[in-house]
Amino acid sequence: MSLATLDTSQHPNLPSASATLFKAKAAKKFSFEQIAQHIGRNEVATAAIFYGQAKASPEDITNLASLLGIPQEVLEDQLNGFPDRGKSVEMPPKEPLIYRLYEIVQNYGYAYKAVLNEKFGDGIMSAISFSTKVEKETDADGNNWAVITLRGKWLPFSRF
């Protein structure tokens, strides 16, 4: 199985914890799924911690340090602040898979908005009260399909 790694020269905007975490992940040969199971988080949420896009709880830090063999004090120091979200990807993205996700929003964003507004009214889907997961499906012909679920709390706009 191939594992996600990080070339820090290609990602200069990531926090120092990213390099620490990815180096230990590669050394231990763990997938995000394996790490997520150990720390009790979703694999996408776990990967988001590695990329500096999600806040690690004290328990996450303890469990990551133990699993990956990183001194806990180092991780506490590197993961102690609040994430500076949204800086890790240039816009529009150049990485092909990330660009396809961007392209989905470009092509279907207004369609999603229209359908969501019809179903829920005027508002937005939260990316804070939010969860996501990635699943793999194989059809009868043996083709693999990526299934990405986005689940966000509906937040109606306030009238004032």
From Swiss-Prot:
Domain of life per record: Eukaryota
Sorted UniProt keywords: Lyase
Gene Ontology molecular functions: cyanate hydratase activity; DNA binding
Disulphide linkage map: none
SMART domains in alphabetical order: Cyanate_lyase
GO BP: any one term: cyanate metabolic process
EC number(s) reported in the record: 4.2.1.104
Active site: 100, 103, 126
Top enzyme class: lyase
Keyword Lyase assigned: yes
Catalytic reaction(s) noted: cyanate + hydrogencarbonate + 3 H(+) = NH4(+) + 2 CO2
Annotated function: Catalyzes the reaction of cyanate with bicarbonate to produce ammonia and carbon dioxide.
NCBIfam families according to UniProt: cynS
UniProt cross-references to HAMAP family, sorted A to Z: Cyanate_hydrat (MF_00535)
Family named by the database record: Belongs to the cyanase family.
Protein name: Cyanate hydratase
UniProt organism field: Aspergillus oryzae (strain ATCC 42149 / RIB 40) (Yellow koji mold)
